């Protein structure tokens, strides 16, 4: 992205897309968007520098904000504002940035900041796209107009994200034009200079058979032209999650049974919809990127491939629900128990968005791959039954066993 967009465009990784990439993103990206206490805890354990964190989220818990503000308050000298609050003097970590999605969040940030001796908090005011997130234009204008009511906050920028999987470049251009108009209005009506814009473009990732491939370089070059056309010349940060993470992940599942019911071939795999999640997939009607890996028959797994030459299979998971269908009518000639299916382009969200606790099935193991280091196990397969047991003592014993 940097090669096409230029080094002046900052890249923020939305870690909700895949938290297992946090350490790598901390090294490669300019920052990370963090939306919960749990995500913040992952960042701190990974050693993510505080100045790389943008604390976002529609629900900011008071205890969590106090924790982050406290961490930020001891990271540098007090009293910086203006350009210094945005960039920080050389060698001094600046405070984390915070998004504000409501007046109550602003009050919370102001209250927490007033109790520390740290820097004024960098705040990005989130503009709504017509839903529960962010605030409308008039509210944002009113906040900036009354900025003296927030002496411990510095409104450095705007944040805007309207959704994912945008196929039309024209929609992104229109959003940038609207943002540019609002920034110009703030400048002209309030004589206030917004210094940074955090924008989530929601670039499209083709997941399914029949979708047109995306020329990513051309798409990014077109996006750069749209940015250059803006009157706004401050700092621009792009929030990207799916676009970065989706191509980086694959899910491997094994065929454990095959059968034929009323002329339809079914294969059962050891995963299911609790592990596999593609945005836009509905009732297994679309075929995602799948590879078929024939495998020698596993011991103790007799081949019960149904008779007949039909190679079209409906792939179902291990959950006891008719909704656990991954793909319908998938061509798999010669399929047998023990074979494996690899679902590609699944690095975003599937690792966390699955209905993992349903039926108390195990969580899948997670491995990372690097060219030099090869495969590395970062999480083994984990039981979910302790979460569903109903016994507090049993759950606590399991936690102690995992974390002695």
How would you describe each model-predicted region?
Residues 20, 104, 138, 170, ...:
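Conserved active-site and cofactor/substrate-binding residues in soluble primary-metabolism enzymes
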